[in-house]
Amino acid sequence: MKKIDINILGLGNLGTAFFEGLRKNKNLNLYFYEENEKIRNDFAKLHDVITSPHINTLDSGVLILCIKPQNINNFFESFSKKINKDVLIC
């Protein structure tokens, strides 16, 4: 069975909750994005994972947006061309 790519954008309380719920599933590849350097580095050290500040490109899988509602429009303006139409955005 092919693993599903799960991309979590935002590593605050909501992003961390998704991580906690998904991390034991061996059928998932988890990727993490957070602009705030301190939050990103603390999360990476605490959970022994690799994080990135930004999405370069997403061609498949699921993108879970864990960002504040007032930042949604800015996110889509900045990253819509980097996300393939086949990516499920939640």
Tell me what each language-model feature is.
Residues 1-53:
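NAD(P)+-binding Rossmann beta1-loop-alpha1 motif at the extreme N-terminus of oxidoreductases
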Residues 8, 88-89:
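Short glycine-aspartate micro-motif
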Residues 30, 89-90:
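Hydrophobic/aromatic residues located in beta-strands of well-ordered beta-sheets
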